C-alpha cells in the first residue's frame, strides 16, 4: 500500500500535546478488567473477528473491536486519541510512525521481550519500518513490496526466453517487442500524482543503487545514481518510446487493468497483484504473467521498495502492568504465533494474498502451495530479502511529495532535465526539514 499524506511536524506536536493532556485522566483510570480495545481499518474484518474469538476463548481476555474505512481511519484515530477513547492496540501505517510516535499516541514495545524476539525471524525492512528514534513500536500486520512482473507469452512471441535482468535489457526487449508490432508501449509504469507514486519512484531509485534521503534525513536525491533512475525513465518515454507519455496520468490501478487486458509486457506492481493477473476471473491473460527479480541499473542491485502495516500499542494499554501484558499477548496472537503457528498471517495470505514479514513462512508447505499456484515462492522470498523501507517517511512528506511528483512529471514530459527536476525536489526537502 502507498505512503499517506501527513500534516506538518508543528501541527502534529501541538495536537499530540493536547491529546496527551486530554487523555491522561482516562488513561490513569483504565482498569485491567476492561476489554482490550483493538482498532483497525475496514480490511480483513471477518478474519480479525474469527481470530479475536479464538484469542478470547484461549485466554479469557475480553476484547472490544472497532473498524473504520481506510480513507477516514487516520483522522478517526486522531479523534479517538484526543478524546481519550479506550484503544489499546491498533493498526498503524509505516508512513504514520513519526507522527504517531512524536505525538505520544503509541508506545514503544521494547519492554516486551516476547514481542521483540520476533525481530530475529522478520524481514529486515519490516523491522526497520517499526523503528523510530531507536525504539521499536510494533509487530508486522502485513507487508509487501513492488514487484517486476512480465508477460511471458509476449516475450516469447518477440523471441525472448528469459526476462531482462537490467534496466538496459528492459529497454532493449521492449524496443524489440515494439518493433515487431506486438505492443505500442510495452513498459507500463504509473507516474500519476497519487499515493502510489513514491513506491514507483523509490523502486527505480533503489534498483539503480541510489537513495532519496540518507540515514540522517538529509537529501541525496540530487546525486548521480538517483539521476540515472530518472534518466532511464525519461529515455523510455522520450528517446525509445517504449513507455507512454500518458504514464503521468496512469495510476497503480490503471497499470493493473492494462496488464490484465494484455496490453503490457513489463509492469511495476505490488507483488500481491500477481494473483489477480493470473486469475481467469479477473484477467484476460491468466497464466501468462510471471515475476522476475527487479532489474538493476549500471551501479545498482535487484533492490526494490517494501512497505508494511503494523500492530501498535497505546498509552492506554500501559495503564497497569496487567493490562500491558494482556495487550502484548493480543499483539503476539496477531503479529506473532497463535498456539504455536503463524495462523493469522497464513489466513490473510490464503484469503487475500496479503504478504507477511516472517521469513520462515516461505518454507511453510501451505504457504508455498498457495504462492506457487500463481507465482514462484522462492523468487518472492529472494526479492523480499532485497526490499528496503521508504527513506522519505517524515512528518513533512506530504508537502514535499507534491513538489517531487510534479518535478518528475516535468522531466518525463521533457520540460526540464532530470538534474533540474531532482535539484527542485532536493531543495524542497531541505527547506521543509529546516522548517521542521
Question: PLM features: what roles do these ranges have?
Answer:
Residues 1-11, 18-21, 25:
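N-terminal secretory signal peptides
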Residues 272-284, 298-403, 434:
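C-terminal lobe and pocket-closing loops
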Residues 54-124, 131, 156-165, 259-266, ...:
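Extracytoplasmic "Venus flytrap"/periplasmic binding protein-like
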Residues 94-146, 169-171, 197-200, 286-292, ...:
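Hinge/lid segment of periplasmic solute-binding proteins
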Residues 43-62, 404:
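Short, polar/charged alpha-helical segment
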Residues 80, 110-123, 187, 191, ...:
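Short, solvent-exposed loop/beta-turn-alpha elements that line the ligand-binding surface or hinge
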Residues 174-175, 216-247:
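Glycine-centered hinge/linker elements that transmit conformational signals in sensory
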Residues 80, 85-88, 116-155, 185, ...:
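A structural signal for short loop-to-beta-strand junctions that line the ligand-binding cleft
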